[in-house]
């Protein structure tokens, strides 16, 4: 098990975002924060980090539980815990 991983790869492997290219685009637009700091696609993440991801009007806050280089669909949801999901009126 890795101790750190690139943000874009983690989002893809954990299936929080289905494609790494999409994860990269979302991060480049400043729509992902790691521990309260806006993150770039290459930002290293580790277990215990908190992610806030903005998808249009939806905001998802998740805690990283563990890192895996590869994960089957059933295992992917064990890589994180959803802390909060909310909708905003904003749809940028």
From Swiss-Prot:
It holds the Pfam family S4. Keywords: Protein biosynthesis, RNA-binding, rRNA-binding, tRNA-binding. GO terms for biological process: translation. It comes from the Bacteria. Key component of the ribosome quality control system (RQC), a ribosome-associated complex that mediates the extraction of incompletely synthesized nascent chains from stalled ribosomes and their subsequent degradation. RqcH recruits Ala-charged tRNA, and with RqcP directs the elongation of stalled nascent chains on 50S ribosomal subunits, leading to non-templated C-terminal alanine extensions (Ala tail). The Ala tail promotes nascent chain degradation. RqcP is associated with the translocation-like movement of the peptidyl-tRNA from the A-site into the P-site. Belongs to the RqcP family. SMART domains: S4. This is RQC P-site tRNA stabilizing factor.
């Amino acid at each position: 098990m890795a101790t750190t991983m690139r943000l874009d790869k983690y989002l893809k492997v954990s299936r929080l975002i289905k494609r790494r290219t999409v994860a990269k685009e979302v991060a480049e637009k400043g729509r992902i924060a790691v521990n309260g700091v806006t993150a770039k696609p290459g930002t290293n993440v580790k277990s215990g980090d908190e992610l806030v991801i903005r998808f249009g009007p939806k905001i998802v806050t998740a805690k990283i539980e563990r890192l895996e280089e590869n994960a089957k669909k059933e295992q992917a949801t064990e890589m994180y815990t959803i802390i909060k999901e909310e909708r905003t009126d904003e749809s940028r």
